[in-house]
């Protein structure tokens, strides 16, 4: 956290998301432990309904997102599908060289669903 171009992007994206979807619980920039760990969330953002209970994590760029999802996948033994790229004119998917057949299948389903939207 702190002042940087990435933090500015997250602040701007948060404002846009809140304007477009006021019905969603959205908080702005916070460190992962604050977003994920209830005790840390209560300590750092006591008035937030999201801190410590976040279910969606938005990263400021592809590299940061890639690092985050690979850590979760490899250390946490979580199923990770992605990265899922948004905001382009057509669906685009990117697969790691370490992807297996199931990864390709699942990301293909997501890409096909994006194409139908």
Predicted regions and their residues:
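Structural motif
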Residues: 24-27, 55-57, 82-83, 90-93
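Glycine-rich phosphate/diphosphate-binding loop of Rossmann-like nucleotide-binding domains
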Residues: 1-29, 33
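A C-terminal functional module that forms or caps the active site or interfaces directly
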Residues: 50-57, 61-76, 80-84
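Short, ordered loop/turn segments at secondary-structure junctions
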Residues: 29-32, 62-63, 97-98
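A structured beta-alpha segment of the ubiquitous adenosine-cofactor-binding alpha/beta core
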Residues: 31, 41-51
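Short acidic, glycine/serine/threonine-rich loops at helix termini
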Residues: 1-8, 38-41, 68-72, 105-106
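C-terminal functional extensions of proteins
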Residues: 12, 16, 38, 68, ...
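Charged helix-capping and loop-helix junction motifs
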Residues: 9-10, 42-44, 76-77
């Amino acid at each position: 956290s702190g002042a940087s171009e990435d933090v500015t992007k997250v602040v701007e994206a948060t404002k846009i998301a809140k304007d477009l979807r006021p019905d969603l619980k959205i908080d702005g920039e916070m460190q992962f432990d604050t977003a994920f760990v209830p005790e840390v969330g209560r300590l750092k953002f006591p008035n937030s309904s999201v801190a410590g209970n976040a279910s969606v994590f938005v990263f400021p760029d592809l590299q940061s997102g890639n690092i985050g999802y690979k850590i979760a996948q490899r250390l946490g033994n979580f199923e990770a599908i992605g990265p899922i790229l948004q905001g382009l004119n057509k669906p685009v998917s990117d697969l790691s060289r370490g992807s297996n057949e199931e990864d390709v299948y699942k990301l293909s389903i997501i890409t096909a669903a994006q194409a139908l939207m």
